[in-house]
């Protein structure tokens, strides 16, 4: 989508403003309560109800999560190019409610799950049959389709309700973001505490409540229809990227100078109305510049391209370069997500082996232990933004840049995995001595992982949004879930490989179904070592990164390291 000035709003419609946002935020909050409420404890559902081994349950869960995080890229394409954001959210919401109903039925109907088993080892119980697995996977597929439509469109659809040409509209957008992330944090905490607790009491109740909330979300979304602003689709930026690549390939035999000396004539029309960033021609990825070189027959008598798949503007070429430059930094964030998702998953199994009592009458649900990370984020982010950043600026005239924040987050991920390995080693030793370890020992790695998310993931989102032109923000907002998709698939591959190669006839594998016989701490150490290698790779990418021309954030060039940044080069950067 283009920026506001290019929006094609139906003339009889007024800007929705906060009347519309009330329905959009209500829908988004209830939808997330439904989807997260099911996924938060789903590993234990696969383990205890469908009797899957830990590795099998891990693979099913993360293959589903990978599909769920990849789907928003397709959802953004369909929304921008074909049906618009409202219809995308509407259709996706129906798929989400259908998916939740299907998963709930697998818990309600005895024909749709294996018979209950009181054996303390679920792997010795009856396996699910093909029909039961098929119904379960069908429900998960519906949920992935729903997430693919809702995630990439909910924030842009909310922004559409404000006129950003006015000061009031800009303030409304800023306030909308604050409310959006506040409600998301509340949903995460509620889902990992109240909903998870209800699921320990009854899976039927624990799944029925998220399903009911999702149904309320769908109703609320349609009730607000008369208040919404509807922006027509104007075509996807993906087609522009494809045109640049095709045009450059068609002119691959063209010889151009490495330095712009005026011998080539480039196509540089006036930028479209409302485009705030006019990108100059850069000296990176010169092979793409061929797409903008004007040859005989490329222009019509009116001065426009005769074939848009043969001639592109400098602006279009530079937009593709922005994407190419970001990819290495994007890839460096995947290992940290692998660490986070792997730790959160296996810690649920660890918690089942530990003392979870708070007082004589209450036992903490195993899946609720991960809420410590969210609490850490909620405490640390305000401290960082309102205390630490102003303090560093007053004392040293120093601000932590986005890439530095991401690097610090990677370090915290490494420390978290080393700490998790140490805690698991102590837990397993005590288990052999027939003594249980308090579950609150897991708070140490979870707090460190919460700090990783506060630095790395928030910095990554800001980085993506600062390094793309305005109308490419849909790509920027798709890259983050796409990194989770890549991490989910990599996690599944890593777990499967370690499970197969780490065991022998005389020694169980590291990820044995019985944690007391396995070596989960070794697996944590392996991911920590991968994190160290990834930190070196990230430093190299950050060291060589060239910021988008005109960007106010220029904290790296080929002669500056991760920590060697002069304050006067950051004076225009807002605290982050």
UniProtKB/Swiss-Prot annotation:
The keyword DNA repair does not apply. Pfam families: PTR2. It is a multi-pass membrane protein. Disulfide bonds: none annotated. GO terms for molecular function: low-affinity nitrate transmembrane transporter activity; symporter activity. It comes from the Eukaryota. GO terms for cellular component: plasma membrane. Keywords: Cell membrane, Membrane, Nitrate assimilation, Symport, Transmembrane, Transmembrane helix, Transport. InterPro entries: MFS_trans_sf, POT_fam, PTR2_symporter_CS. The chain crosses the membrane at residues 58-78, 89-109, 130-150, 176-196, 203-223, 329-349, 364-384, 406-426, 441-461, 475-495, 522-542. This is Protein NRT1/ PTR FAMILY 2.12. The lineage of its organism: Eukaryota, Viridiplantae, Streptophyta, Embryophyta, Tracheophyta.
């Amino acid at each position: 989508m283009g920026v506001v000035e290019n929006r094609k709003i139906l003339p009889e419609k007024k800007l929705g403003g906060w009347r519309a946002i009330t329905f959009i935020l209500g829908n988004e909050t209830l939808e997330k309560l439904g989807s997260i409420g099911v996924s938060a404890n789903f590993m234990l559902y696969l383990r205890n109800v469908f009797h899957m081994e830990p590795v099998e349950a891990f693979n099913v869960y993360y293959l589903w999560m990978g599909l769920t995080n990849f789907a928003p890229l397709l959802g953004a394409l369909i929304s921008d190019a074909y049906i618009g954001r409202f219809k995308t959210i509407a259709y996706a919401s129906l798929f989400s409610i259908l998916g939740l109903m299907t998963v709930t039925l697998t818990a309600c109907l005895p024909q749709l799950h294996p018979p209950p088993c009181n054996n303390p080892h679920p792997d010795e119980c009856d396996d699910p049959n093909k029909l039961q697995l098929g119904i379960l996977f069908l429900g998960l597929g519906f949920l992935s389709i729903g997430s693919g439509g809702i995630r990439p469109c909910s924030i842009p659809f909310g922004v559409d309700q404000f006129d950003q040409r006015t000061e009031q509209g800009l303030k409304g957008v800023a306030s909308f973001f604050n409310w959006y992330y506040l409600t998301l944090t509340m949903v995460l905490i509620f889902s990992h505490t109240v909903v998870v607790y209800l699921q320990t009491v009854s899976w039927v109740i624990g799944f029925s409540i998220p399903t009911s909330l999702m149904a309320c979300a769908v109703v609320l979304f349609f009730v607000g229809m008369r208040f919404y602003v509807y922006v027509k689709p104007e075509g996807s930026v993906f087609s522009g990227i494809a045109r640049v690549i095709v045009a450059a390939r068609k002119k691959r035999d063209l010889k151009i100078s490495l330095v712009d000396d005026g011998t080539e004539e480039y196509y540089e029309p006036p930028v479209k109305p409302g485009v705030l960033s006019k990108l100059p021609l850069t000296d990176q990825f010169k092979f793409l510049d061929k797409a903008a070189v004007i040859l005989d027959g490329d222009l019509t008598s009116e001065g426009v391209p005769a074939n848009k798949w043969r001639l592109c503007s400098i602006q279009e070429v530079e937009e593709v370069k922005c994407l190419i430059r970001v990819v290495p930094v994007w890839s460096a964030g995947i290992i940290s997500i692998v660490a986070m998702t792997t730790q959160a998953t296996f810690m649920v199994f660890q918690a089942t082996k530990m003392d979870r009592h708070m007082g004589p009458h209450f036992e903490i649900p195993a899946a609720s232990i991960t809420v410590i990370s969210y609490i850490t984020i909620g405490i640390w982010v305000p401290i960082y933004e309102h205390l630490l950043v102003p303090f560093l600026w007053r004392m040293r005239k120093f601000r932590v840049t986005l890439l530095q924040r991401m690097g610090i987050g990677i370090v915290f991920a490494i420390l978290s995995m080393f700490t998790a390995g140490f805690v698991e080693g102590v837990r397993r030793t005590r288990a052999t001595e027939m003594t249980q370890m308090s579950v609150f020992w897991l708070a140490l790695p979870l707090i460190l992982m919460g700090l990783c998310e506060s630095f790395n993931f928030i910095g990554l989102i800001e980085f993506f949004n600062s390094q793309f032109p305005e109308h490419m923000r849909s790509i920027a907002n798709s890259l983050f879930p796409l990194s989770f998709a890549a991490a989910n698939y990599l996690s599944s591959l890593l777990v499967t490989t370690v499970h197969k190669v780490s065991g022998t006839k005389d020694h169980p594998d590291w990820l044995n179904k019985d944690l007391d016989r396995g070596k989960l701490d070794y697996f944590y150490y392996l991911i920590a070592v991968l994190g160290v290698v990834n930190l070196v790779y990230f430093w190299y990418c950050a060291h060589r990164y060239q910021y988008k021309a005109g960007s106010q954030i220029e904290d790296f060039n080929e002669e500056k390291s991760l920590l060697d940044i002069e304050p006067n080069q950051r004076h225009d950067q807002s605290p982050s």
